[in-house]
């Protein structure tokens, strides 16, 4: 019996960096600390911002809800793919 190889996850480092930069931009524009946002959203903001973890769409949605943004407003200023 042959076992299937696990699928390799596709990673796009440029996209990851672009999303993280947008999260930092929004958080900083409100003068919020990583800890403040983490405490109020339950998200691990420090891990996202250091690149240790990548936010899922659900995490991005929670982040947007906290800042009263739509996903469209979050992604609109991004120039991706470059």
State the predicted function of each range.
Residues 50:
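Short, conserved catalytic or interaction motifs in soluble domains
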